[in-house]
Each structure stands twice: as structure tokens, then as C-alpha cells.
């Protein structure tokens, strides 16, 4: 099937998807969960082929870790689907109700975006999370995963499509693209596709934006920071730093740079290094850091690097203002944390750091749709428009205005025969 037909089919299916009941969608989600478990052997075999091929092609270790889709990860995504089913139905929610006049009522109501094209890295679990979120939100989805996972993605897409069509979803609601040429062709299909979500480097996201007329929701690098303030609880700071860096290194919310206030650096860094050494973390540092602990010399490139590995860069700063300046210069707008006992400083940091997720005394690894209670996420948006931070169900919704009248015409108001009331109502659209 060519890409134009794939996109056209999704456009047709989007009309039916928008009208599906919550019951039908939840039943389809349950069918996906059952099908993943029933086909786990076939899925793991396909994934093993991808892993073996990628190892021969010398794929980096962190990327191999992302690529692996074993029984544990299958069970994890199944649990994620069940959590998604437990969330309330997102479509048809009344966001606002205004009484314009007697028997003239305006409702702002949630609805699907339509057809979403999502380009993501070599993480098969992401394919399941993305497709199920789109299903729950009533959207059609066109998927392009990393080529390293091509066999796994084919099997997963087939399993999901077969299970959901049997459950009553329209054919064509999900589609898989397999090449860069497919992506370039998809970017031209603005008559069918309503939104593109690219997950990858800043350069990649910029390329997508520059080569498409379709709106783009950016998901770029995760250059995350922890700043240890002079008033921090240093034991807490150590725990947060180690968790932020090492709990799972191959993800975009892992910390890459640690900023330490000069006033506590000599007391804090030796103990931190001992903990990082236990995890075999490679440490790069500026000259001041090197005077305190043994590190490799850091360059400007280190401050701008998303390692996705057991590597961290450390810089000593004069205080919070310098830390914020560093984050503004080198950060990606993803997740940044301050560790401090000083509430005023924490509030100031969270207000001034212009990232989608800003934390006080908590690991950067918390910036995740599942951990936020969103069910799952299609990615972390570093854009400021429409959706920001972990993009869950709410980020995949639009809204429409529904006006319910009884023969009213504008001329009556223009000639002062009638007057607008413009009263806020505590009423839902399904109560009309």
C-alpha cells in the first residue's frame, strides 16, 4: 500500500474513530492486552532478530537496551494498557458552558485531533504506548519507529490492528511506515494528517518542522539538570542525583549535568563520587570539580550532550543565578531540578527555569506520563503551544464549540430586540 493510500485510509477512519463510545474503545484496549500476551513468543522472536542484526551493526549499548522487548517489557505495557482503561473517557467532556441567552447555550467540548503521525526511536514499547493512547483519545495514528526495530514493529502493528478491528474499530485507524522516504511522503499529506509528533534530536525535530506544512509538536533532546543549592540536604541531594542519573540511563528524563553550588562542593562531591563509582558512572567535570574529585575534563560539548549512558558532567557554580543561566544556555527545556531547603529559592527556580518540567527535591526521572498518572505518554513535549511536558491523553485532544439554540438569529441582537446574557452555567453537554 502506498503512503497516500495509507494516509487517506486513516483520514476516512478518523470520522468513525471520533464517534466510538468509551466502552468500545476500552474493549479494544483489553483485546490488545490479551493479544500481546497471546503472541508474546512471536513478538520476542521478532525482537531477537532485531537485536542480533543491530549488534552486528554495532548499535550503541544504550540503544540496544531500549530496543530489547522481552517478557517483562510486554507485561509492563500490558499493565500500562490496563491503567489507561481505568482513566475516564476523554472525549465529550464539557470544558465550559455559557448561557448566551434563554435557550441559546454554548458548550466547549473535547474531541480527537484526528490523524496523528508519530516518528519515534527504536523502542517497541513506545509503539504500544503511542497506539493505545491514540485509541483511547479517539485518534488514528501513523507510526514510524526506528529501523533497528523494524521486525518487532511489524509484528506489533499487525497484532494491534487485528485485535482492534475484530473489536469494532475501523480498518486503517493504525498504519506503519517503514522508511525515510515514507516519512518524507507523509510530511506532504496535510490534507489527511492533523499533527506530527517527532521524537528525537533537536536537529531531527527542526528538519520535520522545516519540511512539513502539518503542525508539529516537538519532542527533542533530554538534557536534564540537577542543581544542588548551598542550603540543600546533601544526603537527599546525593540520593536524587544518583537516581536521576542511574535509575535508567537510556531515557530522555535521566540527568546529564549536575550543577553544584561552590559553597557545598567540597563537602558534597567526594561522597557523591563514591556512590557514582559503585554504578560505574564516568564523570566529566570542570576545573573546579577536578580540584576536588578525580574526573575527566569537560568541554562545552559535554554541557550540550544527551549521553543516554552511565556518564555525567559536573559543573561548580557561584549560586542559583549562574545555575539558571547555564540551564538556559545548554538545556533542552525538558526537566530540571533544584535540591534545596530554601522554599523561596525553589519557587524562584521553578518560575525562572523555562522547562516543561521543573522539580524541587525530586528525581528528574519522575517526568513521565505514567508516573504523573496520565496512563502513558506519546512523548515529552518541549514546545510551549498546545501541550507541554509529558503528553498523555489531554495532549492528544482538541475541542469544539457546540451551540444549542431554538431558532435564534443574529439580527435580533444587532437590532437590540434581544440582549445577550453571557452567564456561566454548571452544566454538561450530555445534560441537554
From Swiss-Prot:
Q: Which InterPro entries does the UniProt entry name for this protein?
A: Ald_DH/histidinol_DH, Ald_DH_C, Ald_DH_N, Aldehyde_DH_dom, G-glutamylP_reductase_CS, Glu-5-SA_DH, GPR_dom
EC number(s)?
Answer: 1.2.1.41
Q: Which GO terms describe its molecular function?
A: glutamate-5-semialdehyde dehydrogenase activity; NADP binding
Catalytic activity reads: L-glutamate 5-semialdehyde + phosphate + NADP(+) = L-glutamyl 5-phosphate + NADPH + H(+)
Q: One GO biological process from the UniProt record?
A: L-proline biosynthetic process
Any Pfam family matching the protein: Aldedh
PROSITE patterns in UniProt: PROA (PS01223)
| Gene Ontology, cellular component aspect | cytoplasm
> Where would you find this protein in the cell?
Cytoplasm
What keywords is this UniProt entry annotated with? Amino-acid biosynthesis, Cytoplasm, NADP, Oxidoreductase, Proline biosynthesis
Which pathway does it operate in? Amino-acid biosynthesis; L-proline biosynthesis; L-glutamate 5-semialdehyde from L-glutamate: step 2/2
Say which domain of life the source belongs to.
Bacteria
Q: What parts of the sequence cross the membrane?
A: none
Q: Chief subcellular site? A: cytoplasm
Role = Catalyzes the NADPH-dependent reduction of L-glutamate 5-phosphate into L-glutamate 5-semialdehyde and phosphate. The product spontaneously undergoes cyclization to form 1-pyrroline-5-carboxylate.
PANTHER family (UniProt xref): DELTA-1-PYRROLINE-5-CARBOXYLATE SYNTHASE, GLUTAMATE SEMIALDEHYDE DEHYDROGENASE
Q: Which family does it belong to?
A: Belongs to the gamma-glutamyl phosphate reductase family.
| Protein name (database record) | Gamma-glutamyl phosphate reductase
Q: Which gene is annotated as encoding this protein in its UniProt record? A: proA
